[in-house]
């Protein structure tokens, strides 16, 4: 009976773990669009020019592909300037295909797709940006983690919550 009790306890723990996990399946991740511009090279690569000012813009979009599958696109644009001259511009749209359970409510699906999905995509997008800037002759641009909850809240306040999956 001890073995049976232990097995039942393990099964119960497994069910609890599964029920508390995020109801999001990552089907694919990919670079949707990518650009690196180094408009003032080689002058911008000369030493002793000081740290560049980085302007970072981030957007998240989601669109349904069918009832349970959606594409989420994390778009980033970073422009580095020194002395009012552009050092580099990197633009990346990094996407993922995600599946949610059919019974999930639309507002919950919207929040998951615009908060949790980009949170999963971000480390990969960050690595691509870092490698691109390094390959462009600069130190790697290491983006700090982003607050996708705050980005989502601002989107809801700015555009209103109409229940459709969209931008954050």
UniProtKB/Swiss-Prot annotation:
The keyword Transport applies. It holds the Pfam family SecB. Residues 1-20 are annotated as: Disordered. The keyword Magnesium does not apply. One of its GO terms (molecular function) is unfolded protein binding. GO terms for biological process: protein folding; protein tetramerization; protein transport. Its main location: cytoplasm. It is found in: Cytoplasm. One of the proteins required for the normal export of preproteins out of the cell cytoplasm. It is a molecular chaperone that binds to a subset of precursor proteins, maintaining them in a translocation-competent state. It also specifically binds to its receptor SecA. Belongs to the SecB family. Homotetramer, a dimer of dimers. One homotetramer interacts with 1 SecA dimer. This is Protein-export protein SecB. It comes from Rhodospirillum centenum (strain ATCC 51521 / SW). The gene is secB.
